[in-house]
């Protein structure tokens, strides 16, 4: 975890802080074929720390402030609510060429984290390529984020992000290491 931001490392390594689980990226398993799409969908959330409750987050934030270490985003198990795609849109998507699935359904995780995973990925659509992503985005009126297997993003409202990305996050590094070991 040497690639984690320093404040995240400091919090995770401080054994006086109770209720810290891990960073989200370490609490999920992703098939290699989906790793770029999911890591793109997660973005900085992959380094957010899952905690038991908002009190644990407050205690950790006090520590970060007192020590002037930096900022961290916490995902409290007791407050995050699931997000999902409405049933009509799901039915539409199921008939569309290129639709792969909802991001939260393409990964494995302990059911304890289902609200958190659903909050971050439950309304993100994964599609095979940018052409199908563009077409599907228009059909659903740009109401949901769409990511492609190559990591392009069609944002809510219609803006598009893409191109080569040489930065890595915890997910892509985890899979590069696994492939290297194989």
Feature locations, PLM:
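Hinge-like oligomerization/junction regions that interrupt long coiled-coil arms in large cytoskeletal
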Residues: 2-182
């Amino acid at each position: 975890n040497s690639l984690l931001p320093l404040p995240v490392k400091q919090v995770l390594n401080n054994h006086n802080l109770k209720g810290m689980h891990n960073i989200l990226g370490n609490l999920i398993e992703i098939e290699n074929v989906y790793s770029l799409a999911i890591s793109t969908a997660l973005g900085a959330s992959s380094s957010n720390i899952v905690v038991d409750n908002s009190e644990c987050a407050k205690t950790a934030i006090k520590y970060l402030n007192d020590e002037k270490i930096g900022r961290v985003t916490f995902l409290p198990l007791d407050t995050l609510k699931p997000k999902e795609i409405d049933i009509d849109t799901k039915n539409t998507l199921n008939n569309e060429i290129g639709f792969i699935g909802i991001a939260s359904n393409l990964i494995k995780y302990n059911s304890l984290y289902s609200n958190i995973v659903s909050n971050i990925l439950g309304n993100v659509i994964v599609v095979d390529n940018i052409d199908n992503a563009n077409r599907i985005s228009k059909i659903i009126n740009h109401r949901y984020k769409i990511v492609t297997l190559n990591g392009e993003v069609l944002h809510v409202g219609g803006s598009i992000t893409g191109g080569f990305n040489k930065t890595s996050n915890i997910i892509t590094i985890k899979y590069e290491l696994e492939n290297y070991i194989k």
